[in-house]
UniProtKB/Swiss-Prot annotation:
Organism name: Bacillus pumilus (strain SAFR-032)
One Gene Ontology CC term in the entry: cytoplasm
UniProt name for this protein: Serine--tRNA ligase
Any single GO BP term: seryl-tRNA aminoacylation
Family matches, as InterPro entries: aa-tRNA-synt_IIb, aa-tRNA-synth_II, aa-tRNA-synth_II/BPL/LPL, Ser-tRNA-ligase_type_1, Ser-tRNA-synth_1_N, SerRS_1_N_sf, SerRS_core, tRNA-bd_arm
Lineage of the organism: Bacteria, Bacillati, Bacillota, Bacilli, Bacillales
Domain of life per record: Bacteria
Pfam families: Seryl_tRNA_N (PF02403), tRNA-synt_2b (PF00587)
Coiled coil region boundaries: none
Keywords for the protein's UniProt record, in alphabetical order: Aminoacyl-tRNA synthetase, ATP-binding, Cytoplasm, Ligase, Nucleotide-binding, Protein biosynthesis
Sequence positions that bind ATP: R262, S263, E264, E349, I350, S351, S352
Gene Ontology MF annotations: ATP binding; catalytic activity, acting on a protein; serine-tRNA ligase activity; transferase activity
Residues that coordinate or bind L-serine: T231, A232, E233, E285, S385
EC number: 6.1.1.11
Assembly behavior: Homodimer. The tRNA molecule binds across the dimer.
Length: 424
């Protein structure tokens, strides 16, 4: 949520920046009108309340003097009725304003490239060499089928499309990956490990920005106002909802492993095979709470920490700076890390690292005290995937496949897989 004071003072400048996102700004235009109406209603109400207080004092004086106060009492009732009417109108206006505030996306940072689609994203850097195969590389689902480690068909029978059973070495590879990722982030980078709930309430989904705008993308629990988490970002960020953090505690860094659940609304026909786009998948999520002046330095650090996973796995990747039209609703700036997928001859997203500035903190009322006894301010929140586990499995199966159908296990994972060197 944007700062309402900033919206009032910098309305035209903010509107210009939001226009680069390609958003419909009809609601945004209504903000100025409604905010002006709100202030007028508050002014009228305050005048009437002041008048009511004066009349109340006059009634008290007349009653003490045993004089007739009926005409003044009647005036007080009329003033009270008018106040109630204005209060009701004010409540309606404030609800409309709140709806608009919750529907306005974050303001892009000045360093975000201006563009409309993913084609306008800007490559920041590349790492690693793409493998040179002496044979036609297979897609990961075919590699997995030969190894008998992933079962999409039976998962489709048990649940439906976009689900999978991991079996044998496939399950062990998945487990090895998220344990390796957590160990790296906790032991080397100093994150605090958290195992979160997989269901959250409406306030939590609103706090991180999934609601109200993207409710159709979420899995809702019938007859309960709970949602399956689309990412551990939601419960972890909301751990500190409605809290004031002492400044010396910052930065706070959390690493969380969880299953994630997404309806993939609007993705019909895309990535219908394999692990790239599933309704349920595992992910290691990194969440940071930082001082505002440190947040962009922390974004670079967060991105490097996610990259380190791919470097240790020796998987080639590139880092992309998302343009204004591909930024996402909540981010002020976002990097996507894309891993090389040989069978598709392209890079695919495996991590997003975002700085939300105070956008989520304002929605979730997360503040910090810069100095002892100082007035609380909103923290800046960041999050990144460190990494999406299923997509990492796909990248390993494709980049490490051999002509005989076996798959070399990355060296860093071997201690997690009983020191096996090859999947066969």
């Amino acid at each position: 949520m944007l700062d309402i004071k900033q919206l009032r003072t910098d309305f035209d400048q903010i509107k210009e920046k939001l226009a680069h996102r390609g958003e419909d700004l009809a609601d945004f235009d209504k903000f100025g009108e409604l905010d002006q109406k709100r202030r007028e209603l508050i002014g009228k109400t305050e005048v009437l309340k002041s008048r009511r207080n004066e009349v109340s004092q006059q009634v008290a004086v007349l009653k003490r003097e045993k004089k007739d106060a009926d005409h003044i009492i009647q005036e007080m009732r009329e003033v009270g009725d008018e106040i109630k009417k204005l209060d009701d109108e004010l409540r309606t206006v404030e609800e409309s304003l709140q709806h608009i505030l919750f529907s306005i996306p974050n303001i892009p940072h000045d360093t975000v490239p201006v563009g409309e689609t993913e084609d306008d994203n800007v490559e920041v850097r590349k790492w690693g060499e793409q493998p040179a195969f002496s044979f036609e590389p297979k897609p990961h689902w075919d590699v997995a089928d030969e190894l008998n480690i992933l079962d999409f068909e039976r998962a489709g029978k048990v649940t439906g499309s976009r689900f999978v059973f991991y079996k044998g070495l496939g399950a062990r590879l998945e487990r090895a990956l998220y344990n390796f990722m957590l160990d790296l982030h906790v032991d080397e980078f100093g994150f605090t490990e958290v195992l979160p709930p997989y269901m959250v309430n409406r306030a939590s989904m609103t706090g991180t920005g999934q609601l109200p705008k993207f409710e159709e993308d979420a899995f809702k629990i019938r007859e309960e106002d709970y949602f399956l988490i689309p990412t551990a970002e939601v419960p972890i960020t909301n751990m500190h909802r409605d809290e004031i953090i002492e400044g010396e505690q910052l930065p706070i860094n959390y690493a969380a492993f969880s299953a994630c659940f997404r309806s993939e609304a609007g993705s019909a026909g895309r990535d219908t095979r394999g692990l790239i786009r599933q309704h349920q998948f595992n992910k290691v999520e990194l969440v940071k709470f930082v001082r505002p002046e440190d947040s962009y330095e922390e974004l670079e650090k967060l991105t490097n920490q996610a990259e380190k996973v791919l470097q240790l796995l020796n998987l080639p990747y590139r880092v992309m700076s998302m343009c204004t039209g591909d930024l996402g609703f909540t981010a002020a700036k976002k990097y996507d890390i894309e891993v090389w997928i040989p069978s598709q001859d392209t890079y695919r997203e495996i991590s997003s690292c975002s700085n939300f500035e105070a956008f989520q903190a304002r929605r979730a009322n997360i503040r910090f005290r810069p100095e002892p006894k100082a007035k609380p301010e909103h923290v800046h929140t960041l999050n990144g995937s460190g990494l999406a586990v299923g997509r990492t499995v796909a990248a390993i199966l494709e980049n490490y496949q051999q002509e005989d159908g076996t798959v070399i296990i990355p060296e860093v994972l071997r201690p997690y897989m009983g020191n096996k060197e090859v999947m066969k």
